[in-house]
Structures are given as C-alpha cells and as structure tokens.
Design a protein with these regions (language model features):
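Active-site-proximal loop/helix segment associated with metal-binding centers of metalloenzymes
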Residues: 119-120, 137-155
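Short active-site oxyanion
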Residues: 48-50, 128-132
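Catalytic cores of soluble, metal-dependent hydrolases
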Residues: 1-51, 59-63, 70-75, 146-281
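Short hydrophobic segments within beta-strands
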Residues: 81-83, 134, 185
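Aromatic-lined glycan-binding groove of carbohydrate-active enzymes
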Residues: 128-130, 137-144, 178-182
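Active-site histidine-anchored catalytic micro-motif
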Residues: 45, 49-119, 222-223
Length: 281
C-alpha cells in the first residue's frame, strides 16, 4: 500500500457572517468544494484512492461530485455509504441556521444553490438510489419529508437497534460487485459521543466502538472501497485525543486491518484489493 500525502488545500477562512439568501458563507463553501472536486478527480484519474480529511461535511459535495463524474467516465456504478448522525438533506428554505454542512446530500441530489449543484456537470450529481445512509438519528421535520419523497435508503439507529449492525450493513452493501465504486463518507459524529466527543454537533445514541468496527470491517470485506471522506473531527472539542485515535483505528479497519482471531468466513464476499496509492486531498 503506497501512501502519497498531497498536503493541505489552501482556501478562504471562515468569515463568521450571518446567512445571506438562506446560506451561510456560500462563496467560501463553493470555493472550497471546487478545490476538493479538482483534487479528488485528479487522484481518481491517476487510478489512486483519494482520502479527503476535512473539514465539515459540506466538503462531501465536491468530493462526491468528483467521484460521480469519474464513475460516469469509467462506467462504474456508484454506491455512497453516508455514515452520519444527520441526514444532511436540509435546504435554505428549511434550515434556520443556513449552514451548508447540513445540506450536502440535498445538494448532491439536486436541491441547493446552482454554484454547488453543477460542480461535476450534470444535475443532480447523483441519484438517490446510489445512496445509503447509516447511523442517522437527528432529522428536522421538513428534512424528513424530503428524504422520504426522494426514496433514500436510510438505516437509522432504530433500525440498527432492531436488527443489529451486521444485518444493517448487509442491507446497505447489497448489490455491490466488481463494477461498483464504493465511496464512504464518514462523518465522525456518526459515532456515539461517549466514545467520540471531538465533533461540533454531537448526537447521543450512536454506534458503539464495536458496532463501528464491524461497520468498517464489512465495508472492507467487499474489496470495493475506492474513495473516502473523513470529516467533522474537531480537535478543539476532543478529550485527550480520544476521537482522533478512534478515527485512526476505524480507518485502519476500513482498509482491511481485522480484529478477527478466527479465520474470516469470506463465502460470497470479495477480498480487499490494495489500491495503487492513497492520496490525501
């Protein structure tokens, strides 16, 4: 496994302004997402596996727009696993804060400012059928209505509680094959704040350490991971680096590090194929 660190992208700072026309800091968010889109697309064109270290989850707009563009060119079917406490399907009409990090899924599905919708050309960048959301437990009423109207597959925490993480991930990963590009968008607030306090928008009742490990291991078992976002980790809110250390452990599992003592049962599963390189955009 060859790792290439592309360093930090450079862009505008946070101007800390009130929303304008329903969006906070739209110009800055557009600027950053264009940078991310171009950086991720460049790595994909070199047949590398891009890893984006954010930053808030609005950066998923640029990252996934680039992945969708690449899939259209390569003929791959896209599957997006969105691991998050929130559905992120707000719009400027629904959001009281105007924060775009609560709107990335809506933007990717065609609901949002034109500057963000068309980053990768066609609008919408993705269709809801390629998206699976896991771990959701905080959704606004209007947002819930939109998610239902779009028919997005949401495996919320009640679903996880009722059937377990193994069954949840089997359902979320169903249909993935050798023609699938698997993109994982991992918002660290997906995790329960008892084990991951270092995020800006904690929501109680998230996956435990072991549930999160199983989630990552099962995605690794597909052998189809092709791009990754890791977002919303905020060291200012962390406790003795607990959240950052946990995120490292989970990403190691996502790349194939196993906690199994027994021989894994891989019947019907594909093994992880090491990518040529990992690039941090």
């Amino acid at each position: 496994l060859k790792v290439v660190d592309r360093g930090n992208l450079a862009g505008p700072g946070n101007p800390v302004q009130a929303p304008a026309n329903g969006y906070r800091h739209l110009d800055e968010v557009v600027f950053w997402n264009r940078l991310v889109h171009d950086a991720v697309l460049a790595e994909l064109r070199e047949e590398r596996l891009p890893v984006l270290l954010g930053g808030d989850h609005s950066l998923g707009i640029g990252s996934i727009s680039a992945v969708a563009r690449h899939c259209r060119t390569s003929g791959k079917r896209l599957r997006v696993l969105w691991l998050d406490a929130h559905a992120d399907f707000n719009t400027h009409e629904l959001s009281p804060s105007g924060n775009l990090h609560g709107m990335p899924v809506a933007c990717l599905c065609g609901f949002g400012p034109p500057e963000l919708l068309a980053l990768a050309g066609p609008v919408p960048a993705i269709t809801p059928d390629c998206l699976r959301q896991v771990g959701v437990r905080s959704v606004d009423p209007g947002e819930r209505r939109l998610v239902h109207e779009q028919g997005i597959d949401v495996f919320d925490m009640r679903h996880v509680d009722e059937v377990g993480m193994r069954k949840t991930m089997e359902e979320a990963l169903e249909g993935i094959d050798s023609d699938t590009h698997l993109h994982v968008s991992f918002d660290v607030d997906f995790l329960d704040p008892e084990i991951a306090p270092g995020v800006g928008t904690t929501v109680p009742g998230g996956p435990t350490y072991r549930e999160a490990q199983l989630c990552m291991e099962m995605m690794a078992d597909t052998g189809r991971l092709a791009s990754l976002d890791i977002v919303e980790l905020n060291p200012a809110f962390d406790v003795r680096n607990r959240t950052a250390s946990l995120a490292v452990d989970l990403v190691e599992s996502l790349f194939g590090k196993s906690t199994l003592m027994r021989q894994p049962d891989v019947r019907g599963r594909k093994q992880l194929h090491a990518p040529r390189a990992v690039a941090s955009a």
